[in-house]
């Protein structure tokens, strides 16, 4: 039982990285391992509602996570405390998907059926990434190759990658589509060397029509894996096969990434996804509620959207937490109940959200620069230096991408923003006067 407990604790550690904080704390944190018999792992859920939700929403993810840890394909069964002694037949386990499927595309467990273009909510922060993804899906290797999508956690990068895979398979069932994380690519590569199966590994990933690889930033520092992926990339690109890559940052900001690999990522199109605005967050909640068959008052969705502005995963997790809380205490959902359900994950006083406009105004006040001059083409020192400071602070104090910052400064290139950030960072190490001026600007922004 101790080994089972260790296995489940390891699984929970990995699952915590894959789901939102509200989802993890609501559904997974309170679960415990009960038994491992033959090919079935039995997990204890705290109540019947949680058991049913875990069964329908997390079985496949848990099975895949266990497989990544152990290499074993286990079925997952959920029980509630009073049913621990019941026969297996009462609640049949969720069948694990076959990981060695020999069909042209991966098993459905690897492409989430919920992640399609139809279920993707388009907003100002993801409109271009969505359009680029759809173009790639409609004409693989002809529109943008590679397509590099970057942005923060839980903003929809993985959703778009799965959507591309689904679209390609739907319109060409014979297409060989592979989706995986860079971590899985690394693990399989290491295992192939250990087991003397490097040729099989290369054949697997160099003979596909579409390669979708998630979280490429985790290749940083892994020299041998980068070497292998470099040759995989070349082989696919030379054969006009589509490559789609996601990361939490643009190629130029991935540390210890080989220059030759970075340059190849820049061959095609690089597009970012930024956090959704209020209208998009409300639309996301409405679509989620409809998909799950939930009747949620509009005031509750507006309340949640105003409180959770970090990413989509946290947003949807908060909605499900409210629904679960309502079910457990048997009360109707309203704004007060939502506030009670989310009190542990919403800070009492949310920090002020600083915009690029706020920064430009504050820097302008300190350096006597007009707002319009930040976007103008003026290069006089009296304007150029404050502009660089404003770019530096925009990078430090906002979640805006490099292209977005450049756009707010008169459509300047993202490399200009990088240069400004590097220059001010360097000066701050020795220039005490600049340190005081930055401190003054920060005081204004508080």
UniProtKB/Swiss-Prot annotation:
Keywords: ATP-binding, Cytoplasm, DNA replication, DNA-binding, Lipid-binding, Nucleotide-binding
Stored CDD domains: AAA (cd00009), Bac_DnaA_C (cd06571)
Chief localisation class: cytoplasm
Region (Domain III, AAA+ region): 110-326
Region described as Domain II: 81-109
Coiled coil: none
Entry's Gene Ontology cellular component terms: cytoplasm; plasma membrane
InterPro entries in the record: AAA+_ATPase, Chromosome_initiator_DnaA, Chromosome_initiator_DnaA-like, Chromosome_initiator_DnaA_CS, DnaA_C, DnaA_dom, DnaA_N_dom, DnaA_N_sf
Region (Domain I, interacts with DnaA modulators): 1-81
Binding site for ATP: 154, 156-158
Compartment list: Cytoplasm
GO MF annotation terms: ATP binding; ATP hydrolysis activity; DNA replication origin binding; lipid binding
GO biological-process terms attached to the record: DNA replication initiation; regulation of DNA replication
Region annotation Domain IV, binds dsDNA: where it falls in the sequence: 327-446
Assembly description: Oligomerizes as a right-handed, spiral filament on DNA at oriC.
The family this protein is said to belong to: Belongs to the DnaA family.
Domain notes: Domain I is involved in oligomerization and binding regulators, domain II is flexibile and of varying length in different bacteria, domain III forms the AAA+ region, while domain IV binds dsDNA.
The protein's name in its UniProt record: Chromosomal replication initiator protein DnaA
Phylogenetic lineage: Bacteria, Bacillati, Bacillota, Bacilli, Bacillales
């Amino acid at each position: 039982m101790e080994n089972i407990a260790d296995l489940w604790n390891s699984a929970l550690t990995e699952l915590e990285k894959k789901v939102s904080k509200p989802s993890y704390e609501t559904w997974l944190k309170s679960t415990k391992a009960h038994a491992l018999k033959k090919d079935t792992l039995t997990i204890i859920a705290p109540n019947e509602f949680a058991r049913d939700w875990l069964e329908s929403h997390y079985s496949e993810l848990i099975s895949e996570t266990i497989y990544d840890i152990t290499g074993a394909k286990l079925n997952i069964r959920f029980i509630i405390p009073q049913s621990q002694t019941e026969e297996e037949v009462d609640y049949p386990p969720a069948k694990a998907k076959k990981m060695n499927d020999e069909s042209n595309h991966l098993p459905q467990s690897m492409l989430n059926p919920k992640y399609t273009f139809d279920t993707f909510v388009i907003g100002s922060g993801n409109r271009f990434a969505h359009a680029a993804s759809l173009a790639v899906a409609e004409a693989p290797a002809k529109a943008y190759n590679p397509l590099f999508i970057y942005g923060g956690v839980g903003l929809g990068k993985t959703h778009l990658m799965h959507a591309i895979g689904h679209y390609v398979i739907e319109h060409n069932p014979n297409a060989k589509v592979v989706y995986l994380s860079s971590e899985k690519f690394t693990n399989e590569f290491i295992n192939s060397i250990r087991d003397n199966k490097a040729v099989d590994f290369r054949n697997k990933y160099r003979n596909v029509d579409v390669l979708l690889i998630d979280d490429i930033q985790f290749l940083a520092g892994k020299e041998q894996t980068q070497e292998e992926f470099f040759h995989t990339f070349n082989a696919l690109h030379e054969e006009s096969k589509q490559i789609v890559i996601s990361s939490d940052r643009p190629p130029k900001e991935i540390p210890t990434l080989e220059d030759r690999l970075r340059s190849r990522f820049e061959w095609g199109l690089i597009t970012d996804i930024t956090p959704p605005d209020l209208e998009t967050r409300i639309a996301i909640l409405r679509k989620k509620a409809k998909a799950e068959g939930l009747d949620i008052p509009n005031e509750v969705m507006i309340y949640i959207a105003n409180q959770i502005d970090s990413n989509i995963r946290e947003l949807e997790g908060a909605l499900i937490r409210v629904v679960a809380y309502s079910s457990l205490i048997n009360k109707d959902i309203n704004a007060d109940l939502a506030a009670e359900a989310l009190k542990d994950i919403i800070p009492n006083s949310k920090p002020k959200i600083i915009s690029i406009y706020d920064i430009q105004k504050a820097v302008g006040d300190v350096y006597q620069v007009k707002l319009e001059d930040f976007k103008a083409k003026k290069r006089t020192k009296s304007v150029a230096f404050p502009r660089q400071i404003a770019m530096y602070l925009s990078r430090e104090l906002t979640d805006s991408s490099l292209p977005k910052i450049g756009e707010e400064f008169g459509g300047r290139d993202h490399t200009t923003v990088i240069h400004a950030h590097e220059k001010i960072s360097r000066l701050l190490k020795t220039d005490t006067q600049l340190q005081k001026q930055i401190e003054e600007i920060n005081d204004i922004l508080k």
